[in-house]
């Protein structure tokens, strides 16, 4: 557990140093009730050590691990909170930009599909579409494209715009 705490602290420090954030923000809890409790635990573990050596080893290690767990969790949460606060302080609109871009991209794709399929297919009669498909049947690649992308797109790609 101590090694996990040390690895977490080292990871936070390395990330902050790599981002050139040399001023580390350390936030201490001003909760006075939390501070006397660890002192009482340490005195209990020292009194236990005088009565029994094996009991003191286990209680001291337990109190040490709980102290280090609480300090590491508070420091890691404060560093993550400060990192997110700094990110929001730098550019608050940056968090919403990707969503808007994605919506615009989706809308433009749907609009292009509607424009490509709608008027082109509706402008031709059934006889005209049939004559385009007869011309495309002669070319295997055009016929395959007609099956996947549509006859008008395939004819336009291989032979140019339809003559009618």
Swiss-Prot record:
Q: Compositional bias (Low complexity) spans?
A: 30-95
- The reply to whether Signal figures as a keyword in the UniProt entry is yes
Residues bound to Ca(2+) 3 are 137
Q: Where is the signal peptide?
A: 1-18
Q: Which InterPro entries match?
A: GLA-like_dom_SF, GLA_domain, Osteocalcin
The source's superkingdom equals Eukaryota
Give residues where 4-carboxyglutamate occurs: 130, 134, 137
Give each disulfide bond as a residue pair: 136-142
BP GO annotations: biomineral tissue development; bone development; osteoblast differentiation; regulation of cellular response to insulin stimulus; response to vitamin K
Q: How is it modified after translation?
A: Gamma-carboxyglutamate residues are formed by vitamin K dependent carboxylation. These residues are essential for the binding of calcium.
Region of interest (Disordered), residue spans: 30-99
Keyword field: Biomineralization, Calcium, Disulfide bond, Gamma-carboxyglutamic acid, Metal-binding, Secreted, Signal
Q: Which GO terms describe its cellular component?
A: extracellular region
List positions binding Ca(2+) 1.
Answer: 130
Ranges for the Gla domain? 128-160
Residue numbers binding Ca(2+) 2: 134, 137
So what family is this one in? Answer: Belongs to the osteocalcin/matrix Gla protein family.
Main function: Binds strongly to apatite and calcium.
Name of protein: Osteocalcin 2b
């Amino acid at each position: 557990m101590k090694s996990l705490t040390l690895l977490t602290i080292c990871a936070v420090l390395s990330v902050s140093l790599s981002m050139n954030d040399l001023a580390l923000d350390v936030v201490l809890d001003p909760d006075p009730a939390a501070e006397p409790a660890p002192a009482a635990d340490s005195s209990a573990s020292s009194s236990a050590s005088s009565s029994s050596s094996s009991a003191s080893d286990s209680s001291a290690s337990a109190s040490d691990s709980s102290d280090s767990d609480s300090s590491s969790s508070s420091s890691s949460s404060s560093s993550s909170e400060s990192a997110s606060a700094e990110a929001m302080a730098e550019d608050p609109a940056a968090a919403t930009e990707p969503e808007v871009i994605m919506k615009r991209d989706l809308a433009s794709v749907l609009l292009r599909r509607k424009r490509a399929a709608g008027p082109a297919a509706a402008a031709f009669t059934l006889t005209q579409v049939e004559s385009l498909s007869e011309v495309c049947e002669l070319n295997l690649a055009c016929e395959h494209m007609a099956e996947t992308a549509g006859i008008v797109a395939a004819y336009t790609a291989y032979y140019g715009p339809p003559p009618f």
